From Swiss-Prot:
Membrane topology note: Single-pass membrane protein
Keywords from the UniProt entry: Cell membrane, Membrane, Transmembrane, Transmembrane helix
Protein name (record): Type IV secretion system protein PtlG homolog
Biased composition (Pro residues): 92-117
Length: 374
């Protein structure tokens, strides 16, 4: 290869005319370099194939097998890092699903025993003779009503006990349950709630208890409306009490018996009512205000007057003690008088000739009139 002439400063001469006698070997140099390039390219392709083959084998190898590089015969590999691949731990087997707990088996309730049919009992017989009542029971009208209700309640509870109902249940149920009964021959009966018009024959003054009478002013017919059972002119006898409470405006009267013009009598035991059916008889009430408070007021006024007079009559030194003593004495007398008169009961006056009423409280049986012309 020929060297080009250089310039005096050491560089390559810019003007170098080629010598036609000297051959140019530039193309020959390029021709020698081409085989080297192909050789390097083949070596690179071979290395790439080897590298790709090694990577594919390493990935294709099982995960639990450790990779080990074996040197070819007669050659020793340079020392390098050795990686130990531990085998993968097997995943735990899933636990089997526990079966759901079965529903508890409850015992079946036993069927209730059949209830025996209630025994056939005779209905309440109103034909039985009425019990005798003393005068003390007639003095208390509310007590008479309570006794009648208690008797009927005992009858109902006894019937329920016969039907197999407990005593406590019969007591509670008996208040709301009634049994149907037959009233017998309605031509000779007066049912509860019948109104009897009556004219008072005696004056009533409630300072003391006493008797009173009235005369039936209108015929009273039977429950069927066919027969007159209580004719007008029948005398009715009753009793009233004297314990009129403060603020009361009515007196309670209990009528005990009927006396008919034919001579027939029957126990009535029914309360007196006014013309509208309200219980009790109204009248003129004297509340005894003067008797209850007059004495106390008089003593109080006298005490004040005495204190005033003594205050003016005595001197300043001894008047205080005298005034206090007199005032205390009069106040004690007024309090004592008030305690004795404050509980005086009022008095009710009911004049004779007033129109009143009687409300029948129990069934009345007039079967004794059957077969007669009355």
């Amino acid at each position: 290869m020929l060297n080009r002439p250089s310039s005096p400063d050491g560089g390559e001469a810019h003007a170098w005319p080629p010598d036609p006698e000297i051959p140019v070997f530039a193309n020959a140099e390029h021709a020698h370099r081409r085989p080297l390039r192909w050789m390097f390219a083949l070596v690179a392709v071979a290395l790439s194939c080897l590298l790709a083959t090694g990577i594919w084998r390493s990935r294709a190898a099982p995960p639990h097998a450790a990779t080990q590089t074996v040197a070819p015969a007669g050659q020793a590999l340079p020392p390098g890092r050795i990686f130990t691949v531990h085998p993968r731990e097997p995943e735990p087997a899933p636990l089997p699903d526990m079966p759901a707990a079965p529903d508890p088996i409850l015992p079946q309730p036993r069927p209730a025993p059949p209830v025996p049919p209630p025994p056939i009992r005779a209905p309440y017989d109103y034909d039985e003779p009425a019990p005798r009542r003393d005068s003390a029971a007639l003095k208390s009208g509310p007590a008479m009503m309570v006794a009648t209700a208690a008797r009927l309640g005992q009858t109902e509870r006894a019937g329920m006990a016969d039907d197999g109902v407990s005593a406590d249940a019969a007591t509670l149920i008996g208040r709301n349950v009634s049994r149907a009964t037959r009233s017998g021959d309605r031509d000779y009966r007066l049912l509860p709630g019948t109104f009897i018009d009556c004219i008072l024959q005696t004056r009533i003054v409630t300072n003391v208890p006493g008797l009173t009478t009235c005369i039936v002013s209108r015929d009273v017919y039977s429950a069927s409306g066919k027969r007159v059972l209580v004719p007008r002119g029948t005398t009715v006898v009753g009793e009233y009490r004297a314990d009129l409470a403060q603020g009361s405006q009515r007196i309670y009267v209990a009528w005990s018996r009927l006396f008919m013009p034919s001579g027939l009598t029957i126990e009535l035991a029914s309360p007196a009512v006014d013309g509208t059916g309200a219980a009790g008889l109204p009248g003129v009430v004297d509340d005894k205000f003067a008797q209850r408070f007059g004495g106390a007021l008089l003593l109080s006024v006298l005490g004040d007057a005495t204190s005033y007079m003594l205050a003016r009559a005595t001197d300043a030194r001894h008047g205080v003690n005298v005034n206090l003593t007199a005032a205390g004495t009069m106040n004690s007398l007024a309090a004592s008088a008030l305690n004795n008169t404050i509980n005086i009961p009022p008095t009710l006056y009911k004049n004779h000739g007033d129109q009143i009423g009687i409300l029948v409280a129990r069934p009345l049986d007039f079967s004794i009139l059957r077969g007669t012309n009355e």
